[in-house]
Design a protein with these regions (language model features):
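Glycine-rich phosphate-binding loops of nucleotide-dependent enzymes
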Residues: 2-268
Length: 268
């Protein structure tokens, strides 16, 4: 059993604690301060846009949340409980899944193996790791999950390394969507997708909080996508948070200004 969750943190009176909260996160890579006292919160059923130019600290932050990096200072809370996330397995035990820009796929494996790596179905189910791989069940479920995203692949038997960038992206998104039970983190999920696949991913992002009660952190440079699906947006620059905005067509210019450093909330 994972020991990722410790004792509950004090919650504000009468307020349900955020499903995910980061307080005072700092991270150094040698002399480079990748994160500088970053605090964000994600409420249950919410879609949070995490915005910023390249090098703003977004990827470092989400890799700290998912156990890839360890914070030098600050804490991560899940449902108000301090979470000691030491590895991606700890994050998964807490229901957190992520799709990174590098996709983290195994090019020499097929679609089904990539979708279920570390979450293999076995028979009998109660034996778990001691059972036999239920390849038929995994393929059936993989087809159902990809069909729900309207992703059509030329062959399930082909290795992922032979697929197009858009097909690989779709497999990575489908894997994360399939196993996220609390928080889904998506780092530029539509970057390599065509128009139809992009539409399907955006529809899935909008649907997940309502249908499955999964909260989402979306990293995107596409302001139109942020306005369409996000409930709030946090803007990062040079490792710190410089503003929080409710994304609408009217606030799009404000978000861009925060990203490029033309203004900060402190100036208002």
């Amino acid at each position: 059993m994972s020991d990722a969750v410790a004792a509950p943190a004090p919650a504000e009176s009468g307020r349900t604690p955020p499903i995910l909260e980061v307080r005072g996160a700092s991270k150094l890579f040698g002399p480079v301060r990748a994160l500088d006292n970053v605090s964000i919160s994600l409420d249950e059923g919410q879609v949070l846009g995490l915005l910023g130019d390249n090098g703003a600290g977004k990827s470092t932050l989400i890799k700290a949340i998912t156990g890839v990096h360890r914070l030098d200072a600050g804490r991560i809370y899940i449902d108000g409980h301090p979470a000691d996330i030491r590895s991606p397995n700890d994050a998964r035990a807490l229901g957190i899944e992520a799709v990174y820009q590098d996709l983290a796929l195994f090019d020499n494996l097929g679609v089904v193996s990539n979708l279920y790596l570390g979450n293999e179905l076995t028979k009998p189910r109660w034996l778990r790791a001691l059972g036999w791989l239920d390849r038929k069940a995994m393929e059936t479920e993989a087809r159902r999950k990809l069909d729900s995203l309207q992703v059509h692949l030329p062959s399930f038997s082909s290795s992922v390394g032979l697929m197009s960038g858009g097909q690989r992206q779709a497999v990575a998104v489908a894997r994360a969507v399939a196993f996220a039970t609390r928080v889904l983190i998506l780092d530029e999920p539509t970057a390599a997708l065509g128009v139809r696949e992009t539409r399907n991913v955006l529809d899935t992002i909008a649907e997940l909080p309502r249908r499955y009660n999964v909260s989402i952190v979306l990293i995107s440079h596409n302001m139109d996508h942020v306005v369409e699906v996000c409930d709030k947006a946090v803007v990062m620059r040079q490792g710190g948070v410089v503003g929080e905005v409710v994304p609408t067509a009217e606030t799009m210019e404000e978000m861009v200004s925060l990203i490029v450093g033309a203004r900060t909330h402190k100036e208002e």
